[in-house]
């Protein structure tokens, strides 16, 4: 089956976690850097994760080096270091599949940018998402046109070794 330039039979839309296996040493360094260099982002995400999973009881899962919490909201996704918060039970499985990969890309951006994640990624992303929706619709501009969003897609695919389904 062919869709938008990608061969669909190579994509398992039901795949819920990357199958990438890295060395134990890599794992240690990943979390060491996330929780030192990226501390200011991960501490906020970690507190939100604990509240959402331990107090509110929201469903969650591991996704590569990240933890995804499925939220009862209508929005898309939000990444805070190794913590991803995204809409639960979206009716479109392709959206859920793509959003996991995209938000995972933001996890890796945090690893690179650390405390600069807020000014380079989070703030521009929130402004683009919340203030430019009508502009994007009127001018037929993809949400992923913004540098930090296309970068998240690219890195999400690279580090999960999962391909997004193109629209």
Question: Language model features by range: what are they?
Answer:
Residues 57-79, 90, 94:
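N-terminal signal-anchor transmembrane helix
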Residues 98-110:
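Active-site recognition of the HExxH zinc-binding catalytic motif
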Residues 23-58, 68-74, 118-167:
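Metalloprotease/metallohydrolase-associated module, dominated by Zn2+-dependent proteases
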Residues 84-100:
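Short pre-active-site segment immediately N-terminal to the catalytic Zn-binding motif
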Residues 9-21:
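Short, Lys/Arg-rich, polar N-terminal cytosolic tail immediately upstream
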Residues 9-11, 78-88:
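Short, charged cytosolic
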Residues 1-7:
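Short, Lys/Arg-enriched N-terminal segments with co-localized hydrophobic residues
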């Amino acid at each position: 089956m062919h869709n938008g330039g990608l061969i669909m039979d190579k994509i398992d839309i039901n795949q819920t976690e990357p199958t990438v296996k890295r060395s134990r040493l890599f794992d240690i360094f990943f979390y060491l850097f996330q929780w030192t260099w990226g501390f200011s982002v991960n501490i906020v995400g970690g507190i939100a994760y604990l509240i959402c999973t331990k107090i509110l009881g929201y469903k969650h899962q591991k996704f590569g080096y990240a933890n995804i919490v499925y939220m009862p909201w209508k929005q898309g996704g939000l990444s805070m270091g190794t913590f991803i918060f995204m809409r639960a039970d979206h009716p479109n499985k392709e959206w859920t599949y793509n959003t996991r990969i995209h938000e995972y890309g933001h996890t890796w951006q945090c690893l690179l940018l650390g405390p600069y994640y807020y000014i380079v990624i989070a703030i521009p992303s929130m402004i683009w998402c919340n203030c430019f929706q009508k502009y994007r619709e009127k001018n037929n501009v993809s949400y992923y046109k913004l540098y930090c969003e296309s970068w998240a897609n690219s890195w999400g695919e690279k580090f999960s070794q999962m391909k997004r389904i193109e629209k």
